[in-house]
Structure formats: structure tokens, C-alpha cells
From Swiss-Prot:
This is Large ribosomal subunit protein uL29. One of its GO terms (cellular component) is cytosolic large ribosomal subunit. One of its GO terms (molecular function) is structural constituent of ribosome. Keywords: Ribonucleoprotein, Ribosomal protein. One of its GO terms (biological process) is translation. SUPFAM superfamilies: Ribosomal protein L29 (L29p). Belongs to the universal ribosomal protein uL29 family. InterPro entries: Ribosomal_protein_uL29, Ribosomal_uL29, Ribosomal_uL29_sf. The gene is rpmC. The lineage of its organism: Bacteria, Bacillati, Bacillota, Bacilli, Bacillales.
């Protein structure tokens, strides 16, 4: 999801999205460790999505953007 899409969501929706992304990242790491993960690039995508969401949340806290 792009940063502009996160800006259109409510704070609660973004926080819920971050929680689900963290769970997905946790599962992806386990799949990687057990050799079941085929698309390792998904880990990077999920990490970037978490960062985007947290950035938007922080901008809201500071009143930026």
C-alpha cells in the first residue's frame, strides 16, 4: 500500500494494518527459517509497508502533512 493510501485511512485502521503486517512478517520469517518460503522478496515488501504506515502515524502525531 502506498503512503497516500495510508493517509486516507483512519488512525485505528492503520494501527490494525500494522498489527496484521507484523503477524505476516513473523510468519514469513518462520517460513524462511524452515525453507518453505519461495518469494523472499515478500519480507522486504512487508517491512517497507510497516515503515510507511508507521511514518504516516508519526506524521499525524506531529501534525505534519
Amino acid at each position: 500500500m502506498k503512503a497516500n493510501e495510508y493517509r486516507n485511512l483512519t488512525t485505528a485502521e492503520i494501527e490494525q494494518n500494522v498489527t496484521s503486517l507484523k503477524e505476516e512478517l513473523f510468519n514469513l520469517r518462520f517460513q524462511l527459517a524452515t525453507g518453505q518460503l519461495e518469494t523472499t522478496s515478500r519480507i522486504k515488501q512487508v517491512r517497507k509497508d510497516i515503515a510507511r504506515a508507521k511514518t504516516v502515524l508519526r506524521q499525524r502525531e506531529l501534525g505534519i502533512g
